[in-house]
Design a protein with these regions (language model features):
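Conserved structural motif at the start of ABC-family nucleotide-binding domains
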Residues: 6, 24-26
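The feature captures the beta-strand-to-loop junction immediately N-terminal to the Walker
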Residues: 40-42
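Catalytic Walker B motif of ABC-type/P-loop ATPase nucleotide-binding domains
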Residues: 153-157, 162
Length: 299
């Protein structure tokens, strides 16, 4: 067994030979097992590339990525992947799609799990995939992924085509399955609000590099949102991620190096405040609170 779901060391992926063709560069992080991880970043940040590498669909250009203690290719039977475009066979019915999932995952398939997820959306098992809405296709894709009882579930923008009610219901199903079976989940999104209430770990990607990595509570605790009168002294020696002055008021997100001096009002930032401040300032130093390299416990 391993206590690490994903571990990247100097990981990079380049497409083509152009100078600016790097989708990911010098990425290092560790994701422990049993976490629900938000993979966040703007469009084009490298989120989909990182998930494709973890799913074994792309080889890295440089560095190393281990999945569940082994290579992505060897870990593939233990990994579920829901791609952004939900690639399903349009000519198959819902029932035939689940039968295909059973045939592709001998010894691992949990038919009752897959059927329960499909039934939760009131889908007709005889309906052909090509007749389904985007949200219904998402539910079928999730049924396929969870039906194989994965140890690691990777999802690329899984809720993008769902209405708010369907998103809430499907997220509840997903969290219940994760809690019951201890599945590690990585969900990508560029909308932090979708993930804030469900995730306990964060990977923030910007410009193809890891900007923040670690437990969300630890990352929030390492920062302070401070406000005070413009011109107030006392931030020297602290890492200022972002500062803004509006009229006579200065607001900043900092990483304190010790006690604050001066007349500052300080609070722990929300996840959204933390993420947005780092994305608005690409020059802010990266922070990883979980060790990039950890001892693996062999079975």
């Amino acid at each position: 067994m391993t206590d690490t779901a994903l571990r990247a060391e100097a990981l990079g992926k380049r497409f083509g030979r152009r100078r600016g063709g790097w989708a990911l560069r010098e990425c290092g992080f560790r994701l422990p097992t049993g976490r629900v991880c938000a993979l966040v970043g703007p469009n084009g940040a490298g989120k989909s590339t990182l998930l494709a590498l973890a799913a074994g669909l792309l080889p890295p250009t440089e560095g190393r990525l281990t999945v569940l203690g082994t290579s992505p290719a060897e870990a593939r039977p233990r990994v579920g992947f829901v791609a952004q475009d939900k690639p399903l066979y349009p000519q198959l019915t819902v029932a035939e799609t689940l039968l295909m999932g059973a045939g592709l995952n001998p010894g691992r398939w949990e038919a009752d799990v897959a059927e329960r997820i499909v039934a939760g959306g009131d889908l007709d098992p005889k309906a052909r995939v090509r007749t389904l809405s985007g949200g219904q296709r998402t539910r079928v894709a999730l049924a396929l992924a969870l039906g194989k009882r994965p140890e690691l579930l990777l999802m690329d923008e899984p809720m993008a085509d769902l209405d708010p009610l369907a998103r809430h219901e499907l997220m509840g199903t997903l969290m219940a399955e994760a809690a019951q079976y201890g599945t590690t989940i990585v969900m990508s999104s560029h909308v932090v609000a979708e993930l804030e209430d469900s995730c306990d770990h964060l990977l923030l990607v910007g410009g193809g590099r890891i900007r923040l990595a670690g437990e969300i509570d630890d990352l929030r605790a390492a920062h302070r949102r401070v406000s005070g009168a413009a011109g107030t002294a006392g931030l020297d020696g602290h890492t200022v991620v972002e500062s803004r002055t509006t009229g006579r008021q200065l607001t900043a997100l900092i990483r304190p190096a010790g006690p604050l001096t001066g007349d500052w009002r300080a609070s722990v930032p929300s996840l959204e405040e933390l993420v947005l401040a780092h994305l608005r300032n690409p020059q802010a130093p990266a922070l990883t609170t979980a060790p990039a390299v950890a001892e693996e416990s062999a079975a």
